């Protein structure tokens, strides 16, 4: 059975035992274009450079024609016409002593046997500080003069990128076994969790940087070996093969205990989530991109906000996580109206609410994240409400005790018009406009009444003004200041000597009556 078959068998066994696994994706292949500068493999006749202060194992699958191999920090070129030690790694027929390769001539392949072999430089490393070529069957190098190929200019060199750039805590470098079109994992769970199996491709070259702290997983599979005990794993990491593939200040340990709870187990990456988010956001300058919706949500274990909905479930002993996930996939996400959604489901620590006493409820819950991937919004909220209705009807049979839902707001920017096309959005808009108009009319009416009462606002009666004669003067006759030409002013009254007042006036309205009485 070949290496791909063994990996497939291992993954099937993991699935049968309900154990999740994460598969390491990047490699350090010589033939992989993304391991070289300018995203292309060395062309024929090119000079090849490796970082001088790094350790790496490089798998070579094909034949290559190159001119020189150089160290970055040593400008003296090491010509490919050098002696190489080639030690066979096939234990079935190991050689008595390291095989001595003769100097290669121009145009001639370095000796490559039918067995896979690891080539190490005899005196000065062509590779950096400590490294190796792993030559597959039929692979090798041939020497060719610089510039003999049209694609290679004189003095052009191909740079092998830093192999230490691959970090364990980078979620982009792992592939989950249960990943699908409608499924995803929150960022903290994209890295191997406490009860996961970390699987590295067999018979392949790779390089993994262990970050700070201790990484603990259920098992580690590398180079065709499965490590479930710390003693065996520590011996491998201390070996030359282990040092070439694992580096860093962190520690790696295993615990073969599997997750036996049908409702799932907490991932256990909460402590290393800051490093996970730092590695994930490093290409973006350490900042999250702006979400495409208002009131975006950030699920437990996610580094950045997203648009969609979150359904939180509390469960009883009858709840089965895998069975409920399958139910949602087939009964809901398979429907046409939910095709643009992706779902993540896992057990997470439960954050108690402010009005709850500590320890009043379970300390874990099931988090169902419904993420919207398309420009249209609202489908995640509709699915969340459908799940609540389904739980209200079948919750007891499913083992769900209670459920709550949260959903993000409408889109931001130019995409907000899409949300206004929904019937509910249009009715809300019309209701808001009517309420605003009524409020405006009420404010105007109150302002007019206040101004009228204060005397700052008057209006004339046009029908009364029209009925008055043309010659009638406007206003009223003030007897104090008004004097008519045809009426003589009344005589001034004589002051009463008995009065102690020194100044007084007579009211013109009553002055005539008093004068007649005195007469």
From Swiss-Prot:
Describe the location of the VWFC domain by residue ranges. Answer: 256-308
Q: Where are the membrane-spanning stretches?
A: 431-451
Single GO cellular component annotation? Answer: endosome membrane
Q: Which residues form the signal peptide?
A: 1-19
What keywords are assigned to this protein? Answer: Cell membrane, Coated pit, Disulfide bond, Endosome, Glycoprotein, Membrane, Protein transport, Signal, Transmembrane, Transmembrane helix, Transport
Q: Where in the cell is it found?
A: Apical cell membrane; Cell membrane; Endosome membrane; Membrane, Coated pit
Summed up, the tissue specificity of this protein is: Detected in kidney cortex (at protein level).
Query: According to its record, how does it sit in the membrane?
Result: Single-pass type I membrane protein
Chain spans, region Interaction with CUBN? 67-143
Question: Between which residues do disulfide bridges form?
Answer: 43-152, 193-267, 259-265, 277-303, 288-304, 293-307
* Annotated glycan sites: 35, 39
Q: Which Pfam families match?
A: Amnionless
PTM section of the record:
N-glycosylated.
Q: Name one GO biological process term.
A: protein transport
Question: Which residue intervals are topologically Cytoplasmic?
Answer: 452-519
Q: What is known of its domains?
A: The complex formed by AMN and CUBN is composed of a 400 Angstrom long stem and a globular crown region. The stem region is probably formed by AMN and the CUBN N-terminal region, including the EGF-like domains. The crown is probably formed by the CUBN CUB domains.
Q: How does it assemble?
A: Interacts (via extracellular region) with CUBN/cubilin, giving rise to a huge complex containing one AMN chain and three CUBN chains.
Give the protein name, as stated in the record. Answer: Protein amnionless
Q: Which organism is it from?
A: Sus scrofa (Pig)
Name the gene behind this protein. Answer: AMN
């Amino acid at each position: 059975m070949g290496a791909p078959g063994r990996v497939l068998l291992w993954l099937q066994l993991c699935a049968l035992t309900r154990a999740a696994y994460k598969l390491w994706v990047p490699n350090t292949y010589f033939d992989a274009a993304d391991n070289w500068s300018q995203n292309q493999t060395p062309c024929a006749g090119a000079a090849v450079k490796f970082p001088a202060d790094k350790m790496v194992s490089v798998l070579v699958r094909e034949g290559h024609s190159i001119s020189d191999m150089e160290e970055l920090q040593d400008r003296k070129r090491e010509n490919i016409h050098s002696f190489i030690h080639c030690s066979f790694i096939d234990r079935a027929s190991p050689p008595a002593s390291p095989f001595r390769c003769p100097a290669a001539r121009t145009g001639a392949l370095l000796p490559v046997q039918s067995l896979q072999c690891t080539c190490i430089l005899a005196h000065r490393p062509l590779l950096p500080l400590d490294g190796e070529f792993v030559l597959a069957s039929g692979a090798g190098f041939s020497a060719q003069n610089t510039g003999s190929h049209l694609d290679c200019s004189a003095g052009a060199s191909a740079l092998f990128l830093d192999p230490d750039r691959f970090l364990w805590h980078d979620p982009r470098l792992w592939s989950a076994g249960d990943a699908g079109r409608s499924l995803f994992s929150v960022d903290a769970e994209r890295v191997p969790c406490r009860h996961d199996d970390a699987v590295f491709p067999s018979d392949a070259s790779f390089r993994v940087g262990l970050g700070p702290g201790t990484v603990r997983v259920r098992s580690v599979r590398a180079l065709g070996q499965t490590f479930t005990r710390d003693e065996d794993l520590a011996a491998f990491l201390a070996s030359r093969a282990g040092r070439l593939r694992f580096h860093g200040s962190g520690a790696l340990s295993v615990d073969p205990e599997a997750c036996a709870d049908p409702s799932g187990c907490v991932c256990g990456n909460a402590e290393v989530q800051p490093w996970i988010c730092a590695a994930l956001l490093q290409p973006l300058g350490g900042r999250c991109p702006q979400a495409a919706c208002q009131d975006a949500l950030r699920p437990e274990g996610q580094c950045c906000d997203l648009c969609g909905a979150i359904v939180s479930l509390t469960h009883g002993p009858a709840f089965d996580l895998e069975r409920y996930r399958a139910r949602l996939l087939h009964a809901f996400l398979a429907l046409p109206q939910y095709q643009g959604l992706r779902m993540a489901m896992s057990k997470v620590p439960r954050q108690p609410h402010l009005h709850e006493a500590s320890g009043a409820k379970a300390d874990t819950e099931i988090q169902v994240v419904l993420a919207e991937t398309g420009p249209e919004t609202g489908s995640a909220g509709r699915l969340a409400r459908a799940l609540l209705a389904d739980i209200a009807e079948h919750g007891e049979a499913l083992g769900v005790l209670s459920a709550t839902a949260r959903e993000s707001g409408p889109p931001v920017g130019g995409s907000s018009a899409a949300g206004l096309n929904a019937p509910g959005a249009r009715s809300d808009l019309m209701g808001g406009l009517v309420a605003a108009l009524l409020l405006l009319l009420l404010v105007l009416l109150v302002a007019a009444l206040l101004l009228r009462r204060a005397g700052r606002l008057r209006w004339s009666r046009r029908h009364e003004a029209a009925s008055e004669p043309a010659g009638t003067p406007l206003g009223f006759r003030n007897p104090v200041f008004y004097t008519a030409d045809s009426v003589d002013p009344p005589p001034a009254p004589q002051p009463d000597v008995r009065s102690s007042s020194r100044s007084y006036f007579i009211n013109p309205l009553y002055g005539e009556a008093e004068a007649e009485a005195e007469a």
